[in-house]
Amino acid sequence: TNYPKQFVDLDDDFTLFQKTFNRIQSLSNKFIKIKEVLIVTNEKYRYLVLQQLEKLNNNLKFRLILEPISLNTAPSLTLASFAAVNSNLVVLPSDHYIKNDKILTSSIQKAVRHLDDHCIFLLGTKPKSNQSSYGYITYTGNETIKDVTGFVEKPDSNLAQELISNGNSLWNSGIFILKSKTWLNAISITNKLIYKSIEKSWKKKTTDGLFERPDRKSFSKSSSKSIDYAVIEKAISISLKIKLIELKTKWSDLGEYNSLDSIYRKNNKGNIIQGEVIEKDTFNTTV
């Protein structure tokens, strides 16, 4: 679409993208020093991103890395890792709802304190229903930091219910904490095509003011894989530890409009209303 949901103001406040950026600002404290924010987005959204950033009270340095074509999250994270070599990375999707930023900050701080060169941290949330559109992470242990034992991507409702009943699974929030060199080492082993293509595209990048543009030809040769498929689910085979921390606040991946039901209350007509609206013969609608 020309106007992705993360750039839409859903509640007369800030867009999901703006809320994510503000969330990053709240992360910066005596425990975590934010060096810079890497915004990896598609070339066609560059001015939209700048317009939304201009409306914020921003105190952080940011860089705009523009993907020439849309691939998936593994190439995006590989770009960010080449851009921030020898750094700790907090990977935050810009289209998620998170109710309590303080709880998120606390969870990320725990991960950063225990981070090393051979592990990746995930944040997971307690399943609220047998939702089949989310990924599930299975784990062992009752400690704050848990060991991941497996992944089930978008199970059917019966399997999802079984996972919930077992009591040892969380929804995958898509939030990762890791070292850039850990990712680059892992992706170079599990998917050489992504690593080589993105490495070459980054070396041949051009800079135009605020915009950093990876080379299109090299970038286009990369395969389109998610972070989970490219590395996380193959971690055991490359001696990479995957650790899990529960994010104990309300979270939602707003992938579809019906997912708004999880964060906004419906009125007696089944409508979700934001702003001043006159309802007439309107039912089961988001306005």
Where are the predicted features?
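Conserved beta-strand scaffold positions in the cores of enzyme catalytic domains, especially
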Residues: 7, 64, 120-122, 241-244
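Left-handed beta-helix
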Residues: 181-287
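Conserved N-terminal catalytic core of the sugar/cofactor nucleotidyltransferase
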Residues: 9-91, 96-99, 142
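Conserved core of the sugar-phosphate nucleotidyltransferase
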Residues: 101-221, 239
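N-terminal nucleotide-binding beta1-loop-alpha1 segment
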Residues: 1
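A residue-level structural signature of the nucleotidyltransferase/glycosyltransferase Rossmann-like core
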Residues: 89, 175-176, 224, 252
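A conserved hydrophobic position in a structured secondary element of the catalytic/binding core
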Residues: 41, 92, 155, 178, ...
